[in-house]
Amino acid sequence: MSFDVGKDKLYIQDVTLRDGMHAIRHMYGIDHVRAIAQALDEAGVDAIEVAHGDGLNGASFNYGFGAHTDWEWLEAVADVLTRSVLTTLILPGVGTVDELRRAYDIGVRSVRVATHCTEADVSKQHIGIARDLGMDVSGFLMMSHMIEPEALAQQALLMESYGAQCVYVTDSGGALDMDGVRARFQAYDRVLRPETQRGMHAHHNLSLGVANSIVAAQQGAVRIDASLAGMGAGAGNAPLEVFIAAVDRKGWNHGCDVNALMDAAEDLVRPLQDRPVRVDRETLALGYAGVYSSFLRHAEKAAADYGLDTRTILVELGRRKMVGGQEDMIVDVALDLVRERGAAA
């Protein structure tokens, strides 16, 4: 661990325009992304991630189609940034190296290469090509709660060996608590080089997004993901304006204007939420069952279509250990539950 939270500046990575896509079914308009990005840039955020919620080339029947293409969103944001680093996310197998090169041509200079927490080996080509392009590259180990800290650290070590300059603990299910976060970063410290940065991507399904991010920073995570008004899958990400307010009270160096972030969250982002991004019975079920946060809207639709309780579907998905990319199985699970209900009648 080379980062000292008491002395060094945090790297604030906003995800409103990528993870936040899930909250509104990838329906951001061009004017929306431009206004939000400009506000974030002016507020001093270090980097702004832009893509379909499931990364470059994520638009599909499985994940959902967006109001615009990745390229339209990225070009709109690239036009307004003056200091924040334009960032994107790519899932190997969903996005190809061709998409990575095209993103670079638009102006993307930082990328997070995301895999399920046990599948770091599929990130090798994407990390290598991103490094060859001269990009800043982070490894993004999704659903980090699903394996033990030492096993996660071995996956992080693979990403480091491929060239990742930072590796994340990615709590996609919002299922980790502070002890779980601490244990995972301590495991990282035992195997990763000190110069390899650590990052934290929290979800707020158990209302621990801010607390987990603070603990991560105390354990050496320099890069912290957050979003305006928590705009993200499930109960959202760590709310950016709340995290900055909390660490500002601690005297940590974050470089952001907290009032500007509050204004952007309230005036630009919250009005776009067709479903409130908050902890409620459905989003709490995500964290409780350890389910991928972006399953929420899919599960709610299946519940409405088949007369089920969303929580019942989510808990069953958790029991079956479904992971990102298996959105098409949500309807199958719902049909199984309908059959079981009929058999019991």
Swiss-Prot record:
CDD domains: DRE_TIM_HOA. Residues 10-262 form the Pyruvate carboxyltransferase domain. It comes from Rhizorhabdus wittichii (strain DSM 6014 / CCUG 31198 / JCM 15750 / NBRC 105917 / EY 4224 / RW1) (Sphingomonas wittichii). Keywords: Aromatic hydrocarbons catabolism, Lyase, Manganese, Metal-binding. Belongs to the 4-hydroxy-2-oxovalerate aldolase family. GO terms for biological process: catabolic process; L-leucine biosynthetic process. GO terms for molecular function: 2-isopropylmalate synthase activity; 4-hydroxy-2-oxovalerate aldolase activity; manganese ion binding. Disulfide bonds: none annotated. The active site is at H22. It is an enzyme of class 4 (lyase). The record marks R18 as: Transition state stabilizer. This is 4-hydroxy-2-oxovalerate aldolase 2.
